[in-house]
């Protein structure tokens, strides 16, 4: 009797929860390492005597490496497993994060940020493959929503931590410090993770049985799906629909994320510490909404686009109100409203991606979608830097660009059929074979 009670207590915490938590930490440190530069940027620009366009290129060059290696990184995870690829990648980018603090040359800093982006490019495909391996299909939307909270917490923590460290020790120290935790985390993943849930020493029969339904579905469709290749995936309209949705969405997201601190300092006249705090607020609000987006998309599975579309549109309207506000208090309010609905839409979107792509090419397929976002991440900060410089320091045109882009993302989402998961997925109810 006591043994049975102990077994029940132990079974409440599942291996997949640990996997998700560690994946969450990986995403968190990836965002911390890439986002501290947005707070440090005015000081880097002053130290290295950079124009707004040069600062924009410094923000964008990360995404050049990130986009370039996104698909190859996903393919590596499909071939070698997410454990090895993720552990090596996080150690790689953490080393180059710390090296950033030792650079005194602008060209060399561009090179470091580019190589840093190559390492981070391996994470998305590996992380989504890990979720596909360990989570039953009915929980993947929630899992991706929880994982995506780092899209909000990362910039929030980075803003506050970077402002505090820069204020006390200067901008170089923040990069040196941020690189250390990732190395430790990478070693943990290498020694403690398994690609196949069946190989994990703490995996229970009870938890494996929850995956059996997905496994059996995959076996029943094995013959039909055996010929599915990554090349054939490129012929699927749904891949390109999702890729273009994510491209336009990320034009807005990375413009909002990259230039918000500079906007608050240069246009609204806030201090460094106030900028850190107010830059963090939208992402703290978004932490709630991104989980809510994943949860709601699970509730309307098969019609996930109807969670994405209205929230993307509302976010664009909030950005318009933010642009038109003369009061700093209202600017802060509207930026929080914009972030809430932006991240709610984001949580719903990745539930659709994970549920739609064939399991055996999950990492490569999701990396392709994310690659388009990376291309947007390269274009957006650089273009906005040029627009700011060309307009004599005005941010008006950048807001118009962000509003237009997120509305276009919603319009593209309208072209997806209501039963997309059922009609387009080759095996949407499967988990990955390790």
Language-model-derived ranges and their functions:
Residues 70-81, 290-302, 388:
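Helix-to-loop junctions at the C-terminal end of transmembrane segments
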Residues 49, 81, 96, 102-108, ...:
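Helix-breaking motifs and short loop linkers at transmembrane-helix boundaries and internal kinks
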Residues 37-38, 231-291, 346, 350, ...:
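Extracytoplasmic gate region of multi-pass secondary transporters
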Residues 79-90, 298-312:
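Cytoplasmic membrane-interface "Motif A"-like loop-to-helix N-cap segments
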Residues 68-107:
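Conserved MFS/SLC helix-loop-helix module at the cytosolic interface between two early adjacent transmembrane helices
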Residues 112-152:
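Cytoplasmic helix-loop-helix junction between adjacent transmembrane helices
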Residues 302-352:
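C-terminal transmembrane helical hairpin of 12-TM major facilitator-type secondary transporters
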């Amino acid at each position: 009797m006591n043994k049975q009670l102990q077994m029940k207590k132990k079974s409440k915490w599942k291996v997949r929860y640990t996997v998700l938590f560690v994946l969450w930490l990986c995403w968190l440190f990836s965002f911390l390492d890439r986002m501290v530069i947005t707070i440090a940027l005015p000081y880097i620009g002053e130290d290295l005597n950079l124009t707004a366009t040069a600062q924009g290129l410094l923000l964008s060059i990360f995404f050049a490496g990130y986009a370039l290696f996104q698909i190859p990184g996903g393919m590596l995870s499909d071939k070698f497993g997410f454990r090895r690829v993720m552990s090596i990648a996080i150690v790689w980018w953490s080393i180059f994060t710390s090296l950033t603090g030792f650079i005194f040359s602008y060209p060399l800093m561009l090179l470091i940020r580019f190589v840093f982006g190559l390492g981070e490019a391996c994470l998305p495909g590996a992380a989504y493959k890990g979720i596909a391996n360990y989570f039953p299909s009915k929980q993947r939307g929630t899992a991706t929503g929880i994982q995506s909270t780092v899209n909000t917490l990362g910039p929030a923590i980075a803003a506050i931590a970077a402002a505090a460290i820069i204020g006390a020790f200067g901008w170089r120290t923040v990069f040196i410090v941020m690189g250390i935790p990732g190395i430790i985390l990478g070693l943990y993943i290498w020694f403690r993770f398994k690609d196949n849930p069946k190989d994990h020493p703490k995996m229970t029969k009870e938890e494996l049985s929850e995956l059996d339904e997905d496994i059996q579905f995959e076996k029943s469709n094995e013959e039909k799906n055996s010929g599915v290749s990554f090349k054939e995936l490129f012929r699927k309209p749904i891949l390109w629909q999702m890729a273009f949705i994510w491209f336009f969405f990320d034009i807005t997201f990375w413009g909002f994320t990259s230039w918000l601190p500079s906007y608050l300092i240069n246009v609204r006249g806030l201090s460094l510490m106030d900028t850190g705090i107010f830059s963090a607020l939208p992402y703290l609000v978004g932490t709630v909404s991104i989980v809510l987006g994943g949860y709601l998309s699970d509730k309307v599975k098969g019609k996930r686009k109807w969670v994405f579309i209205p929230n993307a549109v509302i976010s664009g309207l909030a950005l318009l109100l933010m642009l038109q506000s003369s009061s700093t208090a209202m600017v802060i309010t509207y930026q929080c409203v914009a972030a809430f609905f932006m991240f709610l839409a984001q949580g719903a979107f990745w539930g659709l991606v994970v549920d739609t792509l064939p399991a055996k090419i999950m990492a490569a397929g999701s990396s392709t979608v994310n690659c388009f976002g990376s291309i947007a991440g390269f274009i957006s900060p650089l273009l906005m830097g040029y627009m700011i410089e060309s307009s004599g320091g005005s941010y008006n045109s950048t807001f118009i660009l962000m509003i237009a882009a997120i509305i276009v993302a919603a319009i593209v989402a309208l072209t997806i059929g209501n039963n997309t998961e059922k009609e387009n997925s080759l095996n949407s109810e499967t988990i990955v074979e390790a």
